[in-house]
Design a protein with these regions (language model features):
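Conserved "landmark" site that anchors the functional core of diverse proteins
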Residues: 1-314
Length: 314
């Protein structure tokens, strides 16, 4: 069990998402950076899809009621176990009554707190993820707050302290063409890849809004019916400024879709900063389906290497 003493950010329970229900209008939800969540779980000898806490836009303070292995992945942060610094992509074991404090997220947006055995919350529609729009899943279907007691899956477990290779941060994101790609002007196809895009502050788990010097335009107006739009889809509304649909997106979209972020890059794209500093710049490039598959396979090899390292330290 962990007890949340203070909560300054937005935190909720997520696994890799809810699949197979979009035809009923039920969204995917799940971790914004699925690779980071899976890496943290494997570091703790959990199944990759074990539920963890996703935190953004602030920190928290919590205490453990028993010996509990834990780790952080995803965003980097300033964090302490009592008064000792702890670091992302390292495995630690907290003792009973120790306090874990995250003061701030320093690089990235989404921080994952994984614990041995995960968090014991009800499975709803084959997932532990919180659907914040619909108000179900996770812990009571809501954001976590001070005073919450979260049961954990393993009690009084001790694991040795080890680290794994962190996931790189990058603002160079790869795309594949989407269904209406050929309906955009040739200049727009070039602008998508050559123009510097900025992430707007009103971006969220539903979608990342982008702005650039020049807008994307169609060859001619389109009349479209809404159809399926998964995470990573880049829609272009009438103002010509793209919106990238993210984990909490609606199940369908009616704007023209110019491209889609490849699955391997979704987590890195999610970690790009929301401000007008140099760090908020994003650069896109179109890749082949073969390259998209190869990059996905590289992520799977990264997870396999974590399994090997953890197994070697048992």
């Amino acid at each position: 069990m962990i007890y949340i003493e203070k909560m300054y950010g937005f935190a909720h329970i997520q696994d890799i998402g809810r699949f197979g229900f979009r035809n009923f209008g039920i969204g995917h939800a799940g971790a914004m950076d699925s690779l980071a969540l899976q890496a943290g779980n494997l570091l703790l000898e959990n199944a990759p899809n074990t539920p963890a806490i996703e935190v953004t836009l602030g920190g928290f303070s919590l205490t453990f009621d028993c010996d509990t292995p834990f780790c952080f992945t995803g965003a980097l942060c300033e964090a302490y176990l009592d008064d000792q610094p702890v670091y992302a992509y390292w495995r630690y074991t907290a003792k009973a009554r120790q306090r874990l404090t995250v003061k701030q997220i320093t690089i990235g947006n989404y921080l994952y707190l994984c614990v041995a055995g995960g968090f014991r919350v009800p499975k709803v529609l084959d997932s532990y993820s919180t659907d914040l729009k619909a108000g179900f899943g996770g812990y009571q279907g809501r954001l976590l707050r001070a005073g919450d007691n979260l049961p954990t899956g393993k009690r009084d477990t001790v694991l040795s302290s080890i680290s794994i290779e962190p996931i790189d941060f990058t603002n160079k994101i790869h795309l594949i063409p989407s269904s209406e790609f050929e309906d955009f002007t040739e200049q727009s196809k070039l602008l998508l890849q050559q123009q510097t895009w900025r992430l707007e502050k009103n971006s969220s788990r539903m979608g990342y809004r982008l702005s650039g010097e020049k807008k994307l335009t169609l060859k001619q107006p389109l009349e479209m019916l809404s159809y399926a739009a998964p995470m990573g889809t880049i829609q272009v509304p009438p103002d010509g400024m793209p919106i990238v649909l993210m984990a909490d997106t609606q199940t369908t979209g009616g704007y023209p879709k110019i491209a889609c972020v490849i699955e391997a890059d979704l987590g890195q794209f999610a970690q790009c900063a929301f401000n007008h500093s140099k760090q908020s710049a994003v650069y896109f490039s179109i890749v082949s389906y073969q390259e998209a598959r190869e990059r996905y396979q590289q992520n799977q090899e990264y997870l396999t290497n974590i399994r090997r390292k953890v197994n070697a330290t048992r």
